[in-house]
Structure formats: C-alpha cells, structure tokens
C-alpha cells in the first residue's frame, strides 16, 4: 500500500469519525476530537464534507469551528461545510450553528446525491447515495486524465509522431476516481471502475455480530473494494467491541484494517 502521509484518519463506530485528505485540504466528517488531534493544522482545512448527521460524524464541529476563532492562525479564513439535506438533519445543523455563531467565516451548503463541484482545474468532487441512513452520502474526488485512444495503443512511436504531426486526434479524456469516501455504509450502487484510495466501512469483524443492515461486515467491505477495483483500501469504522480482544483476521494485499482506537496516517 502507498504511504505518503496524505490521509489522516480516526474512526471508531458509534464514537467518532473524521478523515482529512491533504492534497485538497478536504475534511470528511468531523467527529469528536478532530480539533484536539489537529491543533493549529485546523486552519489548513478549506472544506468539510459531511456524510450524514449521526453524532459520531459531526460532534466535533463545535470545537473545530470555535477553535478557529481562538487558536493561532488565520481567524478570518473561509470554510465551507457541505451536508446532506434532510428535515431531521437540519435540526442538528441548526443547533451547531447556534453553538458556533461567533465564527462568521463559515458557509453552510445543503446538498443532494447529484452534487458536483470543481475543486481544481483537473479535479472535481461528487456525492452519491449510500445505504446507511435516510440521507447518508459518500463522496468521490475524480481526476481528469488523458490517454491514448484504444485504436492507437499498438502503434509504434514513429507512427504516433506521424499521426500527431498530421493533426490526428489520438488521445481522449477520461475520469479516474482518485479518492472514494464511504463512511458509513452497508453498500452502495454508485458505479466506480477503479480508484486510488477507498475509505470503507468494516464495522463488524465477526459477521455473527451484525444485527441491522446499516454497516458492513469485514467480508462485505472487502468484496466491495474488489468490486470497484480499489488500489488502496482503508477498512475502518470498526466497532469498539473488538478492541480489547480483536479477532485474528487477514485482509488482502492493498488493504489495511484499522482495528485500534488511534489516529492513522497514510
């Protein structure tokens, strides 16, 4: 698995979840303790994308926003928070707004699964529906790439140069999923054909512990990672019931299981 310290993540099912993707200064969910872990690095966050409004995914927002008014850093830096639109969720969002009313540099944007936004001239982010709660979303950061058209792949370098010189259009644009965030979920139907990083719910290490269809078992999580052809998969949001005596499980190459209550870097 690649490790370049671009991802910092902490996730314990039912308690706290947050994931920071450094290349785009994007924070996904903001459970309890995020600001304490990040300290002055909280000013590096440009955007926060909430997957849903369960407390373990947003309870850290008041501390995060209020710390940006008191800690050492650019206190006037703008922050945009994207959240799934729902009647139930709006009550929680409004409560957080009240608790953080002294931070005047926050923009709240309600979104639906058709959300799409450019984040650089070569990247954009989209939201998709996940099976977990009524309003829950996952997120994908796509990279716009260029490749040789299929019909020219067997041509030698001399032929390629000749075709380019003649004005032939031999390349095409395509989109590649650089980063997929899917906490929490017990499945999703979004079509993904390969991705670099996949943040995946693996709440139940023992399939017999699964009581409701709101989270994945480890085997379900692995199967989904294989299905979407993920190059690097972080299996997380593990239930705390396993921390004292974790079962002995193995995961395939290219995957890592976060089965300890500590912050991880990748």
Ranges and model annotations:
Residues 81, 89, 166-266:
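Cap/insert and terminal regions of metallo-dependent hydrolase folds
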Residues 74-79, 85-110, 241:
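Active-site neighborhood of divalent metal-dependent phosphoester bond hydrolases
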Residues 60-68, 91-98, 243-250:
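Metal-dependent catalytic neighborhoods of phosphoester/phosphodiester hydrolases
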Residues 82, 106-112, 126-128, 180, ...:
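General small-molecule cofactor/ligand-binding pocket signal
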Residues 120-193, 197-202:
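Active-site-proximal loop/helix segment associated with metal-binding centers of metalloenzymes
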Residues 33-82, 110:
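Active-site metal-binding motif and surrounding structural segment of the metallo-beta-lactamase
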Residues 1-41, 47, 137-141, 147-148, ...:
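Conserved beta-strand hairpin/beta-sheet module of binuclear metal-dependent hydrolase folds
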Residues 36-42, 117-120, 189-194, 246-249:
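Short loop/helix-cap segments at secondary-structure boundaries that form the rim of catalytic
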């Amino acid at each position: 698995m690649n490790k370049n310290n671009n991802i910092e993540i902490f996730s314990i099912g039912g308690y706290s979840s947050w994931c920071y993707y450094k290349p785009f200064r994007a924070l996904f969910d903001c459970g309890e303790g995020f600001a304490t872990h990040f300290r002055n690095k909280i000013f590096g966050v440009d955007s926060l994308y909430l997957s849903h409004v369960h407390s373990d995914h947003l309870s850290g927002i008041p501390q995060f926003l209020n710390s940006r008014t008191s800690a050492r850093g650019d206190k006037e830096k703008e922050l945009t928070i994207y959240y799934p639109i729902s009647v139930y969720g709006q009550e929680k969002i409004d409560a957080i707004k009240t608790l953080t009313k002294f931070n005047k540099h926050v923009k709240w944007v309600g979104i639906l699964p058709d959300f799409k936004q450019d984040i650089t001239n070569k990247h954009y982010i989209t939201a998709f529906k996940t099976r977990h709660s009524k309003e829950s979303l996952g997120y994908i950061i796509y990279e716009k790439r260029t490749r040789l058209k299929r019909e020219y792949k067997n041509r030698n370098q001399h032929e390629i140069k000749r075709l380019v010189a003649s004005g032939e259009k031999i390349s095409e644009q395509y989109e590649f999923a650089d980063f997929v965030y899917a906490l929490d979920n017990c499945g999703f139907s979004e079509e993904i054909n390969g991705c670099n990083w996949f943040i995946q719910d693996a709440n139940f290490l023992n399939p017999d512990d699964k009581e409701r269809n709101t989270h994945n078992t480890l085997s379900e999580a692995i199967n989904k990672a294989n299905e979407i052809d993920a190059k690097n998969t972080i299996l997380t949001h593990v239930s705390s019931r396993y921390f004292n005596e974790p079962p002995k499980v193995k995961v395939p190459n290219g995957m890592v299981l976060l089965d300890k209550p500590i912050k991880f870097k990748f």
